[in-house]
Amino acid sequence: MLHMDLFGPIAYISIGGNKYGLVIVDDYSRFTWVFFLHDKSETQGVLKKFLRRAQNEFNLRIKKIRSDNGSEFKNTQVEEYLDEEDIKHEFSAPYTPQQNGVAERKNRTLIEMTKSMFDEYKTSDRFWAEAVNTTCHASNSLYLHHLLKKTPYELLTGNKPNVSYFCVFGSKCFVLNKKPKSSKFAPKVYEGFLLGYDSNSRVYRVFNKDSGCVETTCDAMFDETNGSQVEQFDLDIVDN
């Protein structure tokens, strides 16, 4: 069974232009996925794509999902798709969020972890989605299931997680520039800082200080000696 809940709208639009987060939790392993949305109306499309991926990539036989009664979950398009896939849809009773407690608790945990990260590193609110994604990625590989004493990652995949590539959120990095060179004098590396990891993999998400964009790379060297660079960076380039 999968538990799911939508949070938002967040007061600050993320640097990716998102205001909502869709959290999905596997009942057995407590492995968690989080997706970021511009608008609530995107929920059904993201949900359909995820359910197909989960059944193919993780070999999950999804029999049931549980959500609240929000219109993003309770609508004709979603119900027709679930009927086609033979997936049962349970709803929590109105005004009783405890009936969707697994997803609600995970939401609170991710948000509280993100707030702590923001307080520690004085992070711009525009990076909230990147921070939530990072806390979700870390929790899947670091926290033990209270009964089974294994991480969600191991329970889902059967493999122990490799956390050797984890770095301090916001740490300075130097990234190999593999883009086509506009001139012979184009820099071979660019400076940025770490914002997290991509799709539960070892691909880094970094903020390119020159372009003001979030980019993904496997070719980065990190300097964690000076802590987070997020609080030291002039965010005018992000906000403009």
Locate the predicted segments by residue.
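Short conserved beta-strand segments at catalytic cores or DNA/RNA-binding microdomains
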Residues: 16-32, 51, 81, 109-110, ...
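Short, solvent-exposed helix-loop connector elements
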Residues: 116-128, 153-158, 176-186
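Charged alpha-helix within mobile-element recombinases
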Residues: 105-147, 191-194, 198-199
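An active-site-proximal beta-strand-loop segment
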Residues: 1-36, 40, 180-181
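Retroelement integrase C-terminal DNA-binding domain
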Residues: 63, 147, 153-157, 164-169, ...
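Active-site beta-loop-alpha junctions of metal-dependent nucleic acid enzymes
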Residues: 35-58, 212, 220-221
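Residue-level signal for inorganic ion chemistry
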Residues: 30, 50, 68, 139, ...
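RNase H-like two-metal-ion nuclease catalytic core shared by retroviral integrases
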Residues: 19, 67-69, 73-79, 89-113, ...
